[in-house]
Amino acid sequence: MDELLLDLFHKLTSGRQLAAGNGLCGISHKEQEVWKPGHNILVKMRKEDKSLVWLIHSTLARYTQVTNFLGTSRSSVTRCKPGANCPSSHSGISRQLSPLSVTEDSSAPILELQNQGSSGVCGHRVERQNRSADDGTQTHSENSSQENRIKARCLSCTSMVLKGIWGLLIILSVSSSWVGTTQIVKITYKNFYCPFFMTWFSTNWNIMFFPVYYSGHLATAQEKQSPMKKFRECSRIFGEDGLTLKLFLKRTAPFSILWTLTNYLYLLALKKLTATDVSALFCCNKAFVFLLSWIVLKDRFMGVRIVAAIMAITGIVMMAYADNFHADSIIGVAFAVGSASTSALYKVLFKMFLGSANFGEAAHFVSTLGFFNLIFISFTPVILYFTKVEHWSSFAALPWGCLCGMAGLWLAFNILVNVGVVLTYPILISIGTVLSVPGNAAVDLLKQEVIFNVVRLAATIIICIGFLLMLLPEEWDEITLRFINSLKEKKSEEHVDDVTDPSIHLRGRGRANGTVSIPLA
Protein backbone atom coordinates (compact mmCIF):
# COMPACT_ATOMS: atom_id res chain seq x y z
CA MET A 1 0.00 0.00 0.00
CA ASP A 2 2.88 2.36 0.74
CA GLU A 3 4.38 1.60 -2.65
CA LEU A 4 1.06 2.43 -4.29
CA LEU A 5 0.93 5.83 -2.55
CA LEU A 6 4.51 6.64 -3.53
CA ASP A 7 3.72 5.67 -7.15
CA LEU A 8 0.75 7.96 -7.27
CA PHE A 9 2.71 10.79 -5.68
CA HIS A 10 5.56 10.52 -8.23
CA LYS A 11 3.14 10.47 -11.15
CA LEU A 12 1.32 13.53 -9.94
CA THR A 13 4.50 15.54 -9.35
CA SER A 14 5.88 14.59 -12.75
CA GLY A 15 2.63 15.65 -14.40
CA ARG A 16 2.69 18.98 -12.62
CA GLN A 17 6.28 19.67 -13.70
CA LEU A 18 5.44 18.78 -17.31
CA ALA A 19 2.50 21.16 -17.31
CA ALA A 20 4.61 23.96 -15.90
CA GLY A 21 7.33 23.35 -18.49
CA ASN A 22 4.90 23.58 -21.36
CA GLY A 23 3.64 26.90 -20.09
CA LEU A 24 0.15 25.83 -19.61
CA CYS A 25 -1.38 28.32 -17.22
CA GLY A 26 -4.95 27.22 -17.77
CA ILE A 27 -6.56 24.16 -16.49
CA SER A 28 -5.00 21.13 -18.13
CA HIS A 29 -6.67 17.76 -18.24
CA LYS A 30 -4.84 14.44 -18.16
CA GLU A 31 -6.20 10.98 -18.69
CA GLN A 32 -5.05 8.34 -16.23
CA GLU A 33 -5.89 4.65 -16.20
CA VAL A 34 -6.23 3.23 -12.68
CA TRP A 35 -7.74 0.03 -11.16
CA LYS A 36 -10.61 0.98 -8.93
CA PRO A 37 -10.58 -1.30 -5.87
CA GLY A 38 -13.48 -3.70 -5.53
CA HIS A 39 -14.50 -3.68 -9.26
CA ASN A 40 -13.82 -5.96 -12.24
CA ILE A 41 -13.69 -3.34 -15.02
CA LEU A 42 -11.09 -0.84 -15.97
CA VAL A 43 -12.23 2.69 -15.17
CA LYS A 44 -10.80 5.68 -16.96
CA MET A 45 -11.06 8.79 -14.94
CA ARG A 46 -10.21 12.33 -15.88
CA LYS A 47 -9.11 14.56 -13.09
CA GLU A 48 -8.33 18.15 -13.08
CA ASP A 49 -4.94 19.21 -12.22
CA LYS A 50 -5.27 20.69 -8.81
CA SER A 51 -2.99 21.43 -6.00
CA LEU A 52 -0.83 18.84 -4.35
CA VAL A 53 -2.80 19.12 -1.15
CA TRP A 54 -6.03 18.14 -2.88
CA LEU A 55 -4.25 15.15 -4.45
CA ILE A 56 -2.91 14.03 -1.10
CA HIS A 57 -6.38 14.29 0.46
CA SER A 58 -7.93 12.33 -2.37
CA THR A 59 -5.17 9.72 -2.10
CA LEU A 60 -5.82 9.38 1.63
CA ALA A 61 -9.52 8.96 0.89
CA ARG A 62 -8.69 6.22 -1.60
CA TYR A 63 -6.49 4.58 1.00
CA THR A 64 -9.34 4.65 3.51
CA GLN A 65 -11.70 3.04 0.99
CA VAL A 66 -9.16 0.31 0.24
CA THR A 67 -8.71 -0.36 3.97
CA ASN A 68 -12.47 -0.61 4.48
CA PHE A 69 -12.68 -3.00 1.55
CA LEU A 70 -10.00 -5.19 3.10
CA GLY A 71 -11.87 -5.25 6.42
CA THR A 72 -15.15 -6.24 4.81
CA SER A 73 -13.48 -8.97 2.75
CA ARG A 74 -11.77 -10.41 5.83
CA SER A 75 -14.95 -10.32 7.85
CA SER A 76 -16.83 -12.00 5.02
CA VAL A 77 -14.20 -14.71 4.86
CA THR A 78 -13.95 -15.32 8.58
CA ARG A 79 -17.71 -15.40 9.00
CA CYS A 80 -18.06 -18.31 6.61
CA LYS A 81 -18.97 -21.45 8.54
CA PRO A 82 -17.05 -24.64 8.02
CA GLY A 83 -18.46 -26.68 5.22
CA ALA A 84 -20.71 -23.87 4.00
CA ASN A 85 -20.35 -21.99 0.70
CA CYS A 86 -18.98 -18.50 1.17
CA PRO A 87 -21.25 -15.86 -0.36
CA SER A 88 -18.30 -13.94 -1.80
CA SER A 89 -17.56 -16.88 -4.07
CA HIS A 90 -21.04 -16.68 -5.60
CA SER A 91 -21.35 -12.91 -5.85
CA GLY A 92 -20.92 -11.04 -9.06
CA ILE A 93 -18.00 -9.02 -7.72
CA SER A 94 -14.55 -10.50 -8.30
CA ARG A 95 -11.32 -9.52 -6.69
CA GLN A 96 -8.87 -7.05 -8.23
CA LEU A 97 -5.96 -8.38 -10.17
CA SER A 98 -3.52 -6.47 -8.04
CA PRO A 99 -0.93 -7.43 -5.49
CA LEU A 100 -3.47 -6.55 -2.81
CA SER A 101 -6.05 -8.98 -4.21
CA VAL A 102 -3.42 -11.68 -4.53
CA THR A 103 -2.45 -11.38 -0.88
CA GLU A 104 -6.11 -11.34 0.13
CA ASP A 105 -6.82 -14.51 -1.89
CA SER A 106 -3.79 -16.24 -0.45
CA SER A 107 -4.71 -15.33 3.11
CA ALA A 108 -8.40 -16.29 2.77
CA PRO A 109 -7.85 -20.08 2.82
CA ILE A 110 -5.65 -19.71 5.88
CA LEU A 111 -8.33 -17.68 7.64
CA GLU A 112 -10.97 -20.17 6.60
CA LEU A 113 -8.86 -23.09 7.83
CA GLN A 114 -8.21 -21.32 11.11
CA ASN A 115 -11.90 -20.55 11.47
CA GLN A 116 -12.79 -24.14 10.60
CA GLY A 117 -10.29 -25.47 13.12
CA SER A 118 -11.46 -23.22 15.93
CA SER A 119 -15.13 -23.73 15.18
CA GLY A 120 -14.59 -27.48 14.79
CA VAL A 121 -12.82 -27.72 18.14
CA CYS A 122 -15.53 -25.65 19.79
CA GLY A 123 -18.21 -27.71 18.09
CA HIS A 124 -16.58 -30.93 19.21
CA ARG A 125 -16.29 -29.59 22.74
CA VAL A 126 -19.95 -28.56 22.78
CA GLU A 127 -20.99 -31.89 21.30
CA ARG A 128 -18.85 -33.75 23.85
CA GLN A 129 -20.36 -31.70 26.68
CA ASN A 130 -23.88 -32.35 25.38
CA ARG A 131 -23.13 -36.03 24.93
CA SER A 132 -21.59 -36.29 28.39
CA ALA A 133 -24.62 -34.50 29.89
CA ASP A 134 -27.01 -36.77 28.00
CA ASP A 135 -25.00 -39.83 28.99
CA GLY A 136 -25.02 -38.67 32.61
CA THR A 137 -28.78 -38.14 32.71
CA GLN A 138 -29.38 -41.40 30.85
CA THR A 139 -27.07 -43.29 33.20
CA HIS A 140 -28.76 -41.72 36.23
CA SER A 141 -32.22 -42.63 34.94
CA GLU A 142 -31.08 -46.17 34.11
CA ASN A 143 -29.55 -46.56 37.57
CA SER A 144 -32.70 -45.27 39.28
CA SER A 145 -34.95 -47.50 37.16
CA GLN A 146 -32.68 -50.47 37.84
CA GLU A 147 -32.79 -49.76 41.57
CA ASN A 148 -36.58 -49.53 41.44
CA ARG A 149 -36.74 -52.85 39.60
CA ILE A 150 -34.46 -54.46 42.16
CA LYS A 151 -36.58 -53.10 45.01
CA ALA A 152 -39.78 -54.28 43.33
CA ARG A 153 -38.28 -57.73 42.80
CA CYS A 154 -37.11 -57.88 46.40
CA LEU A 155 -40.55 -56.87 47.65
CA SER A 156 -42.27 -59.40 45.39
CA CYS A 157 -39.83 -62.12 46.43
CA THR A 158 -40.34 -61.24 50.10
CA SER A 159 -44.12 -61.32 49.75
CA MET A 160 -43.94 -64.64 47.90
CA VAL A 161 -41.70 -66.12 50.59
CA LEU A 162 -44.01 -64.87 53.34
CA LYS A 163 -47.04 -66.25 51.52
CA GLY A 164 -45.27 -69.56 51.08
CA ILE A 165 -44.40 -69.74 54.78
CA TRP A 166 -47.93 -68.80 55.82
CA GLY A 167 -49.27 -71.30 53.29
CA LEU A 168 -47.15 -74.11 54.72
CA LEU A 169 -48.28 -73.31 58.25
CA ILE A 170 -51.93 -73.06 57.23
CA ILE A 171 -51.74 -76.33 55.24
CA LEU A 172 -50.47 -78.13 58.33
CA SER A 173 -53.02 -76.39 60.57
CA VAL A 174 -55.99 -77.09 58.27
CA SER A 175 -55.12 -80.75 57.79
CA SER A 176 -54.36 -81.21 61.49
CA SER A 177 -57.62 -79.59 62.62
CA TRP A 178 -59.68 -81.66 60.18
CA VAL A 179 -57.90 -84.90 61.14
CA GLY A 180 -58.31 -84.04 64.83
CA THR A 181 -62.03 -83.34 64.42
CA THR A 182 -62.59 -86.63 62.61
CA GLN A 183 -60.62 -88.69 65.10
CA ILE A 184 -62.26 -87.07 68.15
CA VAL A 185 -65.67 -87.92 66.69
CA LYS A 186 -64.57 -91.54 66.34
CA ILE A 187 -63.39 -91.55 69.96
CA THR A 188 -66.63 -89.94 71.19
CA TYR A 189 -68.70 -92.60 69.47
CA LYS A 190 -67.29 -95.26 71.79
CA ASN A 191 -69.23 -93.90 74.77
CA PHE A 192 -71.68 -91.38 73.34
CA TYR A 193 -73.56 -91.63 70.06
CA CYS A 194 -75.75 -88.58 69.47
CA PRO A 195 -74.69 -87.21 66.05
CA PHE A 196 -77.32 -84.48 65.76
CA PHE A 197 -76.67 -83.18 69.27
CA MET A 198 -72.96 -83.13 68.47
CA THR A 199 -73.68 -81.26 65.24
CA TRP A 200 -75.91 -78.72 67.01
CA PHE A 201 -73.38 -78.23 69.82
CA SER A 202 -70.45 -77.67 67.47
CA THR A 203 -72.46 -75.32 65.22
CA ASN A 204 -73.31 -73.11 68.21
CA TRP A 205 -69.60 -72.41 68.59
CA ASN A 206 -69.69 -70.51 65.30
CA ILE A 207 -71.09 -67.55 67.25
CA MET A 208 -67.56 -66.93 68.52
CA PHE A 209 -66.21 -66.45 64.97
CA PHE A 210 -66.94 -62.71 64.82
CA PRO A 211 -65.54 -61.97 68.33
CA VAL A 212 -62.33 -63.77 67.34
CA TYR A 213 -62.17 -61.67 64.17
CA TYR A 214 -62.79 -58.44 66.09
CA SER A 215 -60.03 -59.33 68.57
CA GLY A 216 -57.63 -59.73 65.65
CA HIS A 217 -58.84 -56.38 64.29
CA LEU A 218 -58.04 -54.67 67.60
CA ALA A 219 -54.61 -56.30 67.71
CA THR A 220 -53.53 -55.49 64.14
CA ALA A 221 -55.50 -52.51 62.81
CA GLN A 222 -54.12 -48.97 63.20
CA GLU A 223 -57.56 -47.34 63.22
CA LYS A 224 -59.71 -49.04 65.82
CA GLN A 225 -63.46 -49.27 65.30
CA SER A 226 -66.20 -49.91 67.81
CA PRO A 227 -67.83 -53.38 67.80
CA MET A 228 -71.17 -52.04 66.55
CA LYS A 229 -69.55 -50.03 63.77
CA LYS A 230 -67.50 -53.02 62.67
CA PHE A 231 -70.55 -55.26 62.89
CA ARG A 232 -72.56 -52.91 60.67
CA GLU A 233 -69.69 -52.64 58.21
CA CYS A 234 -69.41 -56.43 57.91
CA SER A 235 -73.20 -56.85 57.65
CA ARG A 236 -73.10 -55.37 54.14
CA ILE A 237 -72.79 -58.91 52.84
CA PHE A 238 -76.57 -59.08 53.20
CA GLY A 239 -77.10 -55.85 51.25
CA GLU A 240 -76.73 -52.09 51.51
CA ASP A 241 -79.30 -51.91 54.32
CA GLY A 242 -77.36 -54.41 56.41
CA LEU A 243 -78.87 -57.23 58.40
CA THR A 244 -82.63 -56.95 58.83
CA LEU A 245 -85.11 -59.48 60.24
CA LYS A 246 -86.40 -60.29 56.78
CA LEU A 247 -82.92 -60.85 55.37
CA PHE A 248 -81.94 -62.77 58.48
CA LEU A 249 -84.71 -65.29 57.90
CA LYS A 250 -84.44 -65.26 54.11
CA ARG A 251 -80.67 -65.55 53.73
CA THR A 252 -79.62 -67.32 56.88
CA ALA A 253 -82.24 -70.07 57.10
CA PRO A 254 -81.32 -72.06 53.95
CA PHE A 255 -77.58 -71.80 54.57
CA SER A 256 -77.98 -72.79 58.21
CA ILE A 257 -79.98 -75.87 57.21
CA LEU A 258 -77.37 -76.86 54.61
CA TRP A 259 -74.56 -76.32 57.13
CA THR A 260 -76.24 -78.51 59.73
CA LEU A 261 -77.12 -81.18 57.20
CA THR A 262 -73.54 -81.34 55.88
CA ASN A 263 -72.05 -81.86 59.32
CA TYR A 264 -74.78 -84.28 60.42
CA LEU A 265 -74.31 -86.53 57.37
CA TYR A 266 -70.55 -86.44 57.86
CA LEU A 267 -70.94 -87.65 61.45
CA LEU A 268 -73.36 -90.37 60.37
CA ALA A 269 -70.84 -91.58 57.77
CA LEU A 270 -68.14 -91.81 60.44
CA LYS A 271 -70.27 -94.36 62.29
CA LYS A 272 -70.37 -96.69 59.27
CA LEU A 273 -66.93 -96.14 57.67
CA THR A 274 -63.40 -95.44 58.76
CA ALA A 275 -62.08 -91.90 59.04
CA THR A 276 -59.88 -92.42 55.98
CA ASP A 277 -62.77 -93.47 53.77
CA VAL A 278 -65.06 -90.66 54.92
CA SER A 279 -62.42 -87.96 54.48
CA ALA A 280 -61.56 -89.33 51.02
CA LEU A 281 -65.21 -89.40 49.95
CA PHE A 282 -65.77 -85.90 51.30
CA CYS A 283 -63.07 -84.65 48.90
CA CYS A 284 -65.53 -85.35 46.08
CA ASN A 285 -67.28 -82.07 46.95
CA LYS A 286 -64.90 -80.27 44.57
CA ALA A 287 -66.23 -82.32 41.67
CA PHE A 288 -69.82 -81.65 42.72
CA VAL A 289 -69.11 -77.92 42.98
CA PHE A 290 -67.83 -77.92 39.41
CA LEU A 291 -70.85 -79.83 38.10
CA LEU A 292 -73.34 -77.57 39.90
CA SER A 293 -71.49 -74.41 38.84
CA TRP A 294 -71.48 -75.59 35.25
CA ILE A 295 -75.22 -76.35 35.34
CA VAL A 296 -76.54 -73.55 37.58
CA LEU A 297 -74.00 -70.72 37.30
CA LYS A 298 -73.07 -71.44 33.65
CA ASP A 299 -69.37 -71.51 34.44
CA ARG A 300 -66.76 -72.33 31.84
CA PHE A 301 -66.65 -75.94 30.69
CA MET A 302 -63.31 -77.65 31.26
CA GLY A 303 -62.55 -81.14 30.04
CA VAL A 304 -59.96 -81.81 32.72
CA ARG A 305 -62.52 -81.14 35.45
CA ILE A 306 -64.99 -83.49 33.81
CA VAL A 307 -62.25 -86.12 33.96
CA ALA A 308 -61.74 -85.27 37.64
CA ALA A 309 -65.47 -85.65 38.32
CA ILE A 310 -65.49 -89.03 36.59
CA MET A 311 -62.50 -90.10 38.67
CA ALA A 312 -64.32 -89.02 41.84
CA ILE A 313 -67.39 -91.06 40.92
CA THR A 314 -65.16 -94.03 40.09
CA GLY A 315 -63.49 -93.75 43.47
CA ILE A 316 -66.89 -93.67 45.18
CA VAL A 317 -67.96 -96.89 43.45
CA MET A 318 -64.65 -98.57 44.23
CA MET A 319 -64.94 -97.51 47.87
CA ALA A 320 -68.34 -99.16 48.09
CA TYR A 321 -66.94 -102.27 46.40
CA ALA A 322 -64.01 -102.46 48.83
CA ASP A 323 -66.16 -104.28 51.42
CA ASN A 324 -68.02 -106.36 48.82
CA PHE A 325 -71.00 -103.99 48.90
CA HIS A 326 -71.71 -104.60 52.56
CA ALA A 327 -74.84 -102.88 53.89
CA ASP A 328 -73.02 -100.65 56.36
CA SER A 329 -70.43 -99.81 53.71
CA ILE A 330 -73.04 -98.76 51.15
CA ILE A 331 -74.96 -96.68 53.72
CA GLY A 332 -71.74 -95.05 54.90
CA VAL A 333 -70.72 -94.20 51.33
CA ALA A 334 -74.17 -92.71 50.74
CA PHE A 335 -73.88 -90.55 53.87
CA ALA A 336 -70.40 -89.34 52.91
CA VAL A 337 -71.44 -88.55 49.33
CA GLY A 338 -74.55 -86.77 50.65
CA SER A 339 -72.38 -84.66 52.95
CA ALA A 340 -70.12 -83.72 50.02
CA SER A 341 -73.17 -82.89 47.89
CA THR A 342 -74.77 -80.58 50.48
CA SER A 343 -71.40 -78.88 51.01
CA ALA A 344 -71.14 -78.26 47.26
CA LEU A 345 -74.70 -76.92 47.14
CA TYR A 346 -73.92 -74.58 50.04
CA LYS A 347 -70.91 -73.15 48.20
CA VAL A 348 -72.76 -72.72 44.90
CA LEU A 349 -75.75 -70.99 46.52
CA PHE A 350 -73.44 -68.74 48.52
CA LYS A 351 -71.71 -67.68 45.32
CA MET A 352 -75.05 -67.14 43.58
CA PHE A 353 -76.83 -65.04 46.22
CA LEU A 354 -74.05 -63.45 48.28
CA GLY A 355 -71.10 -63.47 45.91
CA SER A 356 -67.59 -63.19 47.30
CA ALA A 357 -66.92 -62.10 50.88
CA ASN A 358 -63.86 -60.80 52.69
CA PHE A 359 -62.66 -62.10 56.03
CA GLY A 360 -64.84 -59.80 58.13
CA GLU A 361 -67.97 -60.52 56.14
CA ALA A 362 -67.32 -64.27 56.31
CA ALA A 363 -66.87 -64.05 60.08
CA HIS A 364 -70.11 -62.10 60.38
CA PHE A 365 -71.98 -64.61 58.23
CA VAL A 366 -70.71 -67.70 60.08
CA SER A 367 -71.54 -66.10 63.43
CA THR A 368 -75.02 -65.36 62.12
CA LEU A 369 -75.40 -69.02 61.19
CA GLY A 370 -74.44 -70.03 64.72
CA PHE A 371 -76.93 -67.56 66.18
CA PHE A 372 -79.71 -68.89 63.91
CA ASN A 373 -78.79 -72.46 64.90
CA LEU A 374 -79.03 -71.59 68.59
CA ILE A 375 -82.46 -69.96 68.24
CA PHE A 376 -84.29 -72.00 65.61
CA ILE A 377 -82.57 -75.41 65.55
CA SER A 378 -82.46 -75.98 69.31
CA PHE A 379 -85.87 -77.59 69.38
CA THR A 380 -84.63 -80.49 67.21
CA PRO A 381 -82.24 -82.10 69.77
CA VAL A 382 -84.94 -81.58 72.41
CA ILE A 383 -87.43 -83.52 70.30
CA LEU A 384 -84.86 -86.25 69.65
CA TYR A 385 -84.12 -86.46 73.38
CA PHE A 386 -87.71 -86.96 74.44
CA THR A 387 -88.40 -89.40 71.62
CA LYS A 388 -85.44 -91.48 72.83
CA VAL A 389 -83.73 -91.25 69.42
CA GLU A 390 -80.75 -89.49 70.96
CA HIS A 391 -80.97 -90.02 74.70
CA TRP A 392 -78.45 -89.59 77.49
CA SER A 393 -78.84 -90.20 81.15
CA SER A 394 -77.69 -86.86 82.54
CA PHE A 395 -75.71 -83.82 81.54
CA ALA A 396 -72.95 -84.82 83.91
CA ALA A 397 -72.51 -88.07 82.00
CA LEU A 398 -71.85 -86.28 78.72
CA PRO A 399 -68.24 -86.38 77.41
CA TRP A 400 -67.79 -82.62 77.61
CA GLY A 401 -64.08 -82.82 76.94
CA CYS A 402 -64.52 -84.62 73.63
CA LEU A 403 -67.47 -82.43 72.67
CA CYS A 404 -65.61 -79.19 73.39
CA GLY A 405 -62.49 -80.50 71.63
CA MET A 406 -64.49 -81.45 68.54
CA ALA A 407 -66.34 -78.10 68.48
CA GLY A 408 -63.14 -76.13 69.05
CA LEU A 409 -61.26 -77.91 66.25
CA TRP A 410 -64.21 -77.48 63.90
CA LEU A 411 -64.31 -73.76 64.67
CA ALA A 412 -60.53 -73.56 64.18
CA PHE A 413 -60.89 -75.31 60.82
CA ASN A 414 -63.48 -72.75 59.64
CA ILE A 415 -61.38 -69.83 60.87
CA LEU A 416 -58.21 -71.16 59.24
CA VAL A 417 -59.98 -71.68 55.92
CA ASN A 418 -61.11 -68.03 55.87
CA VAL A 419 -57.85 -66.64 57.25
CA GLY A 420 -55.81 -68.64 54.75
CA VAL A 421 -57.55 -66.96 51.84
CA VAL A 422 -56.29 -63.60 53.16
CA LEU A 423 -52.75 -64.61 54.13
CA THR A 424 -51.84 -67.06 51.38
CA TYR A 425 -53.04 -68.64 48.15
CA PRO A 426 -56.52 -70.26 48.18
CA ILE A 427 -55.22 -73.36 46.44
CA LEU A 428 -53.14 -74.18 49.52
CA ILE A 429 -56.31 -74.41 51.62
CA SER A 430 -57.65 -77.10 49.32
CA ILE A 431 -54.32 -78.92 49.48
CA GLY A 432 -54.57 -78.85 53.27
CA THR A 433 -58.02 -80.42 53.02
CA VAL A 434 -56.87 -83.26 50.77
CA LEU A 435 -53.86 -83.91 53.01
CA SER A 436 -56.30 -84.92 55.73
CA VAL A 437 -56.77 -88.21 53.85
CA PRO A 438 -53.20 -89.50 54.38
CA GLY A 439 -53.29 -88.00 57.87
CA ASN A 440 -56.36 -90.02 58.81
CA ALA A 441 -54.86 -93.07 57.12
CA ALA A 442 -51.73 -92.78 59.26
CA VAL A 443 -53.80 -92.47 62.45
CA ASP A 444 -56.01 -95.40 61.45
CA LEU A 445 -52.97 -97.55 60.79
CA LEU A 446 -51.51 -96.64 64.17
CA LYS A 447 -54.81 -97.48 65.88
CA GLN A 448 -55.08 -100.67 63.79
CA GLU A 449 -58.69 -99.92 62.97
CA VAL A 450 -58.42 -100.44 59.23
CA ILE A 451 -56.72 -102.86 56.90
CA PHE A 452 -56.04 -101.36 53.49
CA ASN A 453 -56.71 -103.68 50.60
CA VAL A 454 -55.86 -102.93 46.99
CA VAL A 455 -59.33 -101.71 46.03
CA ARG A 456 -59.68 -99.29 48.96
CA LEU A 457 -56.17 -97.92 48.40
CA ALA A 458 -56.79 -97.46 44.66
CA ALA A 459 -60.12 -95.74 45.33
CA THR A 460 -58.50 -93.34 47.79
CA ILE A 461 -55.70 -92.48 45.36
CA ILE A 462 -58.13 -91.94 42.45
CA ILE A 463 -60.32 -89.60 44.52
CA CYS A 464 -57.29 -87.58 45.67
CA ILE A 465 -55.98 -87.27 42.09
CA GLY A 466 -59.39 -86.10 40.92
CA PHE A 467 -59.43 -83.53 43.73
CA LEU A 468 -56.02 -82.20 42.68
CA LEU A 469 -57.13 -81.98 39.04
CA MET A 470 -59.98 -79.76 40.21
CA LEU A 471 -57.42 -77.30 41.52
CA LEU A 472 -55.99 -76.61 38.06
CA PRO A 473 -56.68 -73.04 36.89
CA GLU A 474 -58.80 -72.31 33.86
CA GLU A 475 -55.76 -71.33 31.75
CA TRP A 476 -53.77 -74.40 32.76
CA ASP A 477 -53.24 -75.48 29.14
CA GLU A 478 -51.78 -72.10 28.11
CA ILE A 479 -49.58 -72.01 31.20
CA THR A 480 -48.33 -75.52 30.43
CA LEU A 481 -47.49 -74.61 26.82
CA ARG A 482 -45.58 -71.51 27.97
CA PHE A 483 -43.64 -73.60 30.47
CA ILE A 484 -42.74 -76.20 27.83
CA ASN A 485 -41.64 -73.47 25.38
CA SER A 486 -39.48 -71.84 28.04
CA LEU A 487 -37.81 -75.18 28.75
CA LYS A 488 -37.13 -75.66 25.03
CA GLU A 489 -35.61 -72.17 24.77
CA LYS A 490 -33.36 -72.84 27.76
CA LYS A 491 -32.19 -76.12 26.25
CA SER A 492 -31.45 -74.45 22.92
CA GLU A 493 -29.49 -71.68 24.66
CA GLU A 494 -27.48 -74.24 26.61
CA HIS A 495 -26.77 -76.14 23.37
CA VAL A 496 -25.56 -72.93 21.69
CA ASP A 497 -23.32 -72.18 24.68
CA ASP A 498 -21.88 -75.70 24.55
CA VAL A 499 -21.13 -75.26 20.84
CA THR A 500 -19.54 -71.82 21.21
CA ASP A 501 -17.31 -72.75 24.16
CA PRO A 502 -15.09 -75.14 22.11
CA SER A 503 -14.82 -72.51 19.38
CA ILE A 504 -13.48 -69.97 21.88
CA HIS A 505 -10.98 -72.56 23.14
CA LEU A 506 -9.79 -73.30 19.60
CA ARG A 507 -9.33 -69.61 18.87
CA GLY A 508 -7.26 -69.16 22.01
CA ARG A 509 -4.99 -72.07 21.10
CA GLY A 510 -4.59 -70.81 17.51
CA ARG A 511 -3.54 -67.38 18.67
CA ALA A 512 -1.11 -68.85 21.15
CA ASN A 513 0.55 -70.88 18.39
CA GLY A 514 0.73 -67.90 16.07
CA THR A 515 -2.10 -69.08 13.84
CA VAL A 516 -5.78 -68.27 13.69
CA SER A 517 -8.16 -71.23 13.62
CA ILE A 518 -11.71 -70.74 12.35
CA PRO A 519 -14.05 -73.36 13.86
CA LEU A 520 -16.81 -74.85 11.76
CA ALA A 521 -19.41 -73.82 14.32
From Swiss-Prot:
Signal peptide boundaries: none
Listed InterPro entries: EamA_dom, Solute_c_fam_35_mem_F3/F4
Topology in the lipid bilayer: Multi-pass membrane protein
Gene Ontology, cellular component aspect: membrane
Keywords (A to Z) from UniProt: Membrane, Transmembrane, Transmembrane helix, Transport
Pfam families xref list: EamA
Domain EamA positions: 261-321
Localization terms from the record: Membrane
TM annotation in the entry: 160-180, 192-212, 248-266, 277-297, 301-321, 330-350, 365-385, 395-417, 419-441, 450-470
The protein's role, per its UniProt record: Putative solute transporter.
Family: Belongs to the SLC35F solute transporter family.
Protein name: Solute carrier family 35 member F4
Organism: Homo sapiens (Human)
Source species taxonomy: Eukaryota, Metazoa, Chordata, Craniata, Vertebrata
